[in-house]
A protein has these predicted regions:
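Short, highly charged C-terminal tails/helix-capping segments
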Residues: 141-152
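Generic structural detector for well-ordered beta-strands
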Residues: 3-7, 42, 56, 102
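Glycine-rich portal/gate segments that line the openings of hydrophobic small-molecule binding cavities
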Residues: 33-83
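Short, surface-exposed coil-to-beta transition loops
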Residues: 1, 50-55, 94-99
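Hydrophobic ligand-binding cavity/cleft-lining segments
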Residues: 1-32
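Hydrophobic pocket/interface hotspot
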Residues: 13, 23, 41, 57, ...
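Beta-strand/loop substructures that line and gate deep hydrophobic ligand-binding cavities in soluble
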Residues: 77-133, 139
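A short, structured loop/turn motif at beta-sheet edges
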Residues: 10, 58-65, 102-111
């Protein structure tokens, strides 16, 4: 679980979580979805396009909560983000995780809590525990300054 406080509105934070132009700036991922519960979710990252019937929006409560299933670990994705095939194959057999974003207004800021339910012993846990802190820091910086953190 990761929590950060962002000087923004719930509406602006929701926009940053759901609009491809935003997500691409701080995350390097663009999403295609109509963001209704049950809607498909397509990930675009590094030239790869990931789509799967199990890749869906689970909860869509605008300005309060967003949850969806994590992307499918395709060979195309692994090549696009430079993940070895052996690692991709191990990721592909882990149970599909979900990620939940809880937005809670607190005065002139929003408390954002991100929870991802994965196997704590799995490879994905290690990868995401290194990935979420810089993603959320860049999101916060983008919303507060207009520019994301520089990419590594």
């Amino acid at each position: 679980m990761y929590t950060t406080y962002i000087a923004t509105t719930p509406e602006r934070l929701w926009q940053a979580l759901t609009e491809p132009a935003f997500t691409e700036r701080y995350w390097g991922v663009a999403f295609e979805s109509d963001w209704t519960t049950g809607a498909p979710l397509v990930w675009k990252q590094g030239g790869a396009r990931m789509s799967d019937p199990e890749q869906v929006v689970l909860v869509s409560d605008p300005y309060r909560q967003l949850a969806y299933t994590w992307h499918t670990f395709t060979e195309q994705w692994a090549r696009a983000v430079d993940i070895a095939e052996e690692v991709r194959a191990e990721l592909a057999v882990e149970r599909r995780s979900t990620v939940t974003f809880d937005l809670e207004p607190q005065g002139r800021q929003v408390k954002l809590t991100v929870t991802q339910d994965f196997d704590p012993e799995g490879i994905l846990h290690g990868m995401c525990s290194q990935g979420w802190p810089p993603i959320l820091s860049s999101l916060k910086t983008l919303l507060e300054t207009g520019e994301p953190l520089p990419a590594n």
